Amino acid sequence: MITRRDFVGLALAAGGLLAARPVSAENPIAPPEMGDDGLYVQPWYIHTFLDFREDLIAARRHGKRFAVVWEQKGCSACKRLHLVNFRVPEVRDFVRDNFDLLQLNVHGSREVTDFDGTMLEERQLARRYQVLYTPTIQFFPDGLDEFKGRSGKDLEVARMPGFLLPPAFLTMFRFVREKAYERLRFQEYVDRTSV
């Protein structure tokens, strides 16, 4: 598993991979709204019954990957995720078109059903998954064969621990979408794609 230190280094290395197009009259993106829980939300985030097995199956039906973004009220990095990364059309479009992204609150009380059938409140699940930073994005496999009674923490194929600038952020989503994790470490992927 990649460490936060390694990830930050990779994020800086990937900085030149994306020439972000600014938001303009020709390229409008509505600003995000804030939900009742104090979290910014994207209109394309999925809203479900919070059963991860069902969410993954639905993502597959849509031809997408399933990922969870953990956030919290008052998190400045979470705010930047929405006001910086998701305001870049290339980033927003790639994530929206290729992932079913479910937003959870590290302090939330909604009941979530993990892949192994365990039902926990969001905050309990965040502890179970060892979510230490916000935003954190967990990426899960696209197949059901991997479940076999395992929790999401054991199933995740990649994790983005904290805020990354748009180039590195997009690179991680591409890494997962292409299933590059099956053959490369993230650093190797960055090295190969930045050439």
Give the role of each language-model region:
Residues D6-A25:
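N-terminal export signals
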Residues E26-W44:
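N-proximal helix/coil linker or "cap" segments that precede and/or mark the start of modular domains
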Residues T48-K64:
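A short beta-strand-turn-helix
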Residues H62-C75:
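Short active-site neighborhood of thiol/selenol oxidoreductases, capturing the structured segment around
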Residues K79-F94:
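Typically the conserved alpha-helix immediately C-terminal to a functionally engaged Cys/Sec
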Residues R92-L120:
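Thiol-based oxidoreductase modules, predominantly thioredoxin-like and allied folds used
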Residues E122-Q138:
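Structural micro-motif
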Residues Y133, P141-Y181:
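Non-catalytic, surface beta->alpha helical segment in thiol-disulfide oxidoreductase systems
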